């Protein structure tokens, strides 16, 4: 397997990414995600979301979701916006719309969720994921994407 860095992440598919997250210690993920590589890694992950979106599972779902990823350089938080409407998913790192759901989590939790390495419902129940807004939507978000398993 490869190192946990933006270049290696950009060159592997979703399943290999899931295996990489699973094989990398949380402390190493936290270290990398607190540094200069953070934006590239987050951009790579979010840019893949539309390709993993399952319109067949979304049905008539119309939603704006804000993902607040904490633990950035200097204690910063990065916010990405996922818009699900008309059977499609779009993503931006410049949120412009009012969210139906806003989820806040640290980068290790986020990467585990998007790589299938963690149970989002359990993470919510234990406070690792904080959700504000439509909690019914929060419970369904993972089902809207074809999340790889390591």
Where are these regions (language model features)?
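Feature captures hydrophobic
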Residues: 1-150
């Amino acid at each position: 397997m490869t190192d946990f860095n933006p270049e290696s992440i950009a060159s592997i598919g979703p399943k290999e990414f899931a295996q990489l997250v699973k094989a990398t210690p949380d402390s190493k993920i936290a270290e990398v995600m607190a540094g200069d590589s953070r934006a590239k890694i987050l951009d790579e992950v979010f840019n893949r979301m539309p390709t993993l979106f399952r319109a067949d599972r979304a049905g008539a779902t119309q939603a704006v979701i804000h993902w607040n990823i904490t633990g950035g350089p200097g204690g910063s938080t990065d916010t990405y916006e996922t818009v699900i409407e008309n059977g499609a998913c779009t993503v931006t790192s410049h949120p412009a719309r009012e969210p139906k759901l806003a989820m806040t989590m640290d980068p290790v939790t986020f990467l585990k969720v998007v790589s299938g390495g963690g149970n989002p419902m359990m993470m919510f129940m234990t406070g690792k994921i904080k959700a504000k807004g439509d909690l019914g939507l929060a419970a369904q978000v993972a089902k809207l994407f074809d999340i790889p398993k390591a």
